[in-house]
């Protein structure tokens, strides 16, 4: 699963990406400093995995990961191919969801392409570019369906569905908010940009990050996101870049001094994981404790297949204990004595935080 970090030039995208991945992507104070997308695999924070590692002292601890792509700054005219628009939009098309970084601070030393800070305007600018790019694709889809309908009448419905969507997009509304037809379900091959789920990362200065609700820019972003049914995560990209350099104990002390329980980046990564409909199950032992990524609703054999195809092919059963039950008992042996380790079959839907031992035979 892949998330694209997007936003106008100079809103803090690359700084945020660098903090998330600890990768030194070029970050400079001028538009289009990130021409090729930078890709980073990011560990998903999970206290459950940390606790398992404390319990087992394994040789190796492997967290779940999620992929972030830093996509160069979009601007007005991107949907018409202006600037490097076509390249940027193509990079967004390859992602599963969007993290839209919005500037929520004033700084005369960091040039805004519009000359002023207005987060709602910036949100609308990017949203409109994605909608305009989708309109072009939808028009082509309608033409193709109408031609196909001459030989097969079933394509008439497809043409009608996309004509309804075209009218919606023409009003400047995203495909995400279109309810007449479930485009994603009915036409899964249609990769519309404005259909992708989105999280807004409100990039604040240090003072604002400690108390985002006191910042009018943040409140504006929050209100607009609420109208869209989207989530907003407050971050301070510059500060997060410093936090990312600290080890666990130093990081905790730093956050305590700021008066926040969790870094904005940790919240953003977790929220992104949830946005994609992902959960983690855990495996434990002296060799390795590991979090495995699956889609919510995945059944036990398919979850086992994430470890190895043989596990799925020869699946017999899954021995499952919930994280909460294991922590309450203190050891796996104690959980077994209390009858808290369940034997589940092929129809079992794996739950977030399940600790599983798969039995298989090939």
Go through the PLM ranges and name each one:
Residues 14, 31, 67, 117, ...:
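Generic signal for short, ordered secondary-structure residues
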């Amino acid at each position: 699963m892949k998330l694209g970090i997007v936003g106008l030039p100079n809103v803090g995208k690359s700084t945020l990406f660098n903090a998330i991945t600890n990768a030194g992507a070029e970050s400079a104070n001028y538009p289009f400093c990130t021409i090729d997308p930078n890709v980073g695999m990011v560990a998903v924070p999970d206290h459950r995995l940390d606790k398992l590692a404390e319990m087992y002292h394994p040789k190796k601890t492997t967290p779940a990961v999620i992929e972030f792509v830093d996509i160069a700054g979009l601007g007005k005219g991107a949907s018409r191919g202006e600037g490097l628009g076509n390249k940027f939009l193509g990079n967004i098309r390859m992602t599963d969801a969007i993290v839209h970084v919005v500037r929520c601070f004033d700084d005369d030393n960091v040039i805004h392409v519009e000359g002023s800070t207005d987060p709602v305007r910036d949100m609308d600018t990017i949203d409109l570019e994605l909608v305009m790019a989708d309109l072009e694709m939808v028009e082509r889809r309608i033409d193709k369906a109408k031609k196909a309908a001459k030989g097969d009448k079933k394509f008439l419905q497809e043409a009608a569905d996309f004509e309804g969507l075209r009218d919606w997009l023409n009003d400047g509304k995203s495909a995400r908010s279109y309810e007449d037809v479930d485009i994603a379900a009915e036409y899964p091959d249609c990769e519309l940009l404005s259909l992708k789920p989105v999280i807004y990362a409100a990039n604040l200065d240090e003072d604002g990050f400690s108390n985002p609700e006191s910042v009018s820019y943040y409140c504006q972003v929050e209100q607009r996101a609420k109208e869209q049914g989207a989530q907003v995560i407050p971050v301070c990209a510059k500060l997060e870049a410093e936090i990312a350099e600290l080890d666990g104990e130093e990081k905790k002390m730093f956050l305590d001094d700021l008066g926040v329980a969790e870094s904005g980046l940790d919240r953003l990564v977790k929220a992104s994981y949830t946005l994609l409909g992902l959960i983690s199950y855990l495996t434990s032992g002296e060799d390795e404790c590991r979090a495995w990524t699956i889609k919510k609703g995945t059944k036990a054999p398919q979850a086992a297949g994430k470890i190895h195809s043989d596990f799925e092919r020869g699946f017999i059963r899954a021995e499952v204990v919930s994280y909460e039950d294991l922590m309450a008992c203190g050891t796996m042996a104690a959980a077994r004595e209390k009858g808290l380790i369940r034997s589940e079959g092929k129809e079992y839907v794996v739950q977030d935080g399940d600790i599983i031992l798969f039995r298989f035979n090939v």
